[in-house]
Amino acid sequence: AQMQQSRDWSIESEPGLTVGEKITPISSVGLFTPSGKASYPSVAYQLAVPAVVAGVPKVSLVVPPVPGGSGEIDPAVLVVCRKLGIENVFRVNGPAGIAALGFGTESIDKVVKIVGPGSPAVTIAQVEMQRFGTSTMMLLGPTESLVIADQTADPVRLAADLLIEAEHGTDSSVVLLTTSTGLADATDTELDRQLAALPEVRAAACRASLGPNGGCVLVDDLDTAIAVANDYAAEHLQVAVADADVDRVVDGLVNAGEILIGQDTPFSAANFILGCPASLPTSGFAHVASGITADAFLKRTALARADGTAIRRMASNVIALADHEGFPAHANALHLRAATHVQER
């Protein structure tokens, strides 16, 4: 559906003048799939599918070996690559992999763009590659989620959903934004119960994400909740409010990587199968950026064609601007065409 919207287009904006865009895929891309805290085949396919759909002719994927193993790559990541026809798969650790994609090596071809989430070191490596002409996306830092909930929300499901992004690591951030003290208390109790059932390494990550890195914010009303959420600009945002208020809240939310509506739309489903991008803006970048979709692998080239009548009609405006900015060659190109027209007559 997105590719159907990303097609060449042109219109006659005024008599004799046609403008439009030519949309083409970038020539190559390097995808980074993290493997430091766990293996993420879901990230592999949610990065690779848009690149393949966009028609990028050369897609390379870099993935570190699975943690605690003997240097092997998670077979699930290889299955993703095989199903999508990606043959350039390389086992390289984070920053080294980013550098290899950006500069090229004897075995890894240089690419024009690199995308993918990772550790702070991977993020810094991507920023550094921009200095050498390799395009990257917005910074993809530690994961974060925010839930807007009122007194109608189910604290059991709410606690379960808060723990989804919290278990990623001790640098994650999870926030409950609610108008109800009763819901906050009930959710806190339920969090304790559900945390006890998690493996200790995941429970420790959740406690850090909910405690030092996150928490609960009580607000007077949903309008304040909307304002706070827009200021925070969360990577993942869920709306768990009364049906009568859903549309108003969603309409008011403008800064978020994704907005999941209702308590039957958990973050884990969006992470894996709903079709939402896996790599979303973090650290406030949702104020200005979007998730990685097919558009991230396309470029738009402006097209314009004017006939003689149209360019002569616009000549005086072009000449006036050229004279004001001190560019005589700009103006001369229009004077020449006007003079040629007079001679032809």
Predicted feature descriptions by range:
Residues 1-5:
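Long amphipathic alpha-helix in the N-terminal Rossmann-like dinucleotide-binding domain
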Residues 9-13, 31, 61-63, 88-94, ...:
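General beta-strand structural signal in soluble alpha/beta enzymes
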Residues 11-79:
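Conserved small-residue-rich beta-alpha loop and adjacent elements
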Residues 57-66, 174-181, 262:
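Short internal beta-strands
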Residues 85-173:
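Conserved NAD(P)+-binding/catalytic subdomain of aldehyde/semialdehyde dehydrogenases
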Residues 138-212, 216:
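A conserved active-site cap/scaffold subdomain adjacent to cofactor or substrate pockets
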Residues 231-345:
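C-terminal core of ALDH-fold dehydrogenases
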